[in-house]
């Protein structure tokens, strides 16, 4: 209990916060009571309860970590999120590529796509139900969209040249991507509902790696238009680049 905590000893050790808790198991059901304590002020920050089955114990642990992290930093925790990544294994002069998702610590791996052709640049939808990525299965890079629940997938681009670096907007309505169909790598957006491409840059330099601002109204991207690779900001409404 909190009364049993010797805050002075923890201060000497340089600890800033403590997390204490207790676990009650009843059949297949867990009830976890946990508290966050601030050492310097000997203050209770919060006490909360998390409940779930044995199968949910990993998710409960991640949820508790998220709560503690956000209370300390003011930033939403990422412990309950997942990562998408590509692995490659070479055997008998052939390379097998796998698009995978897993918990952030690598647990609960799940195969999404397996191919003898390179897979690149997976990007999550905001609701974490879909991925977009680049696959070379058509003989050139193309952007695909895939539903994680039913494995349905759709090819979104089929242009000559580079089709790459897809990035899903936070509002879920558009993709930012790089196309070189007109000769030079440029930044485009793709309206997922209207299936319409809009070109946003027109420069002799290489523009690539677009990423969205949280409000979905602007992009940051990498360009060597200044002589070396630098990060630029593009306002979508007026096309201004800074």
Feature annotation, model-predicted:
Residues 77-79, 126-127, 170-171, 214-215:
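Residue-level detector of Asp-centered blade-edge/turn motifs that repeat once per structural unit
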Residues 108-113, 152-157, 196-201, 242:
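A short beta-strand motif characteristic of beta-propeller blades
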Residues 83, 131-132, 172-176, 219-220:
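Hydrophobic beta-strand positions that form the internal "hydrophobic ladder"
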Residues 76, 88-98, 114-117, 134-143, ...:
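A flexible loop/linker signature enriched in serine peptidases of the S9 family
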Residues 1-30:
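Short, solvent-exposed, polar/charged sequence segments at loop or secondary-structure edges
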Residues 40-111:
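C-terminal/domain-edge helix-coil "capping" segments
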Residues 40, 103-107, 147-151, 191-195, ...:
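Short loop/turn segments that connect beta-strands within beta-propeller blades
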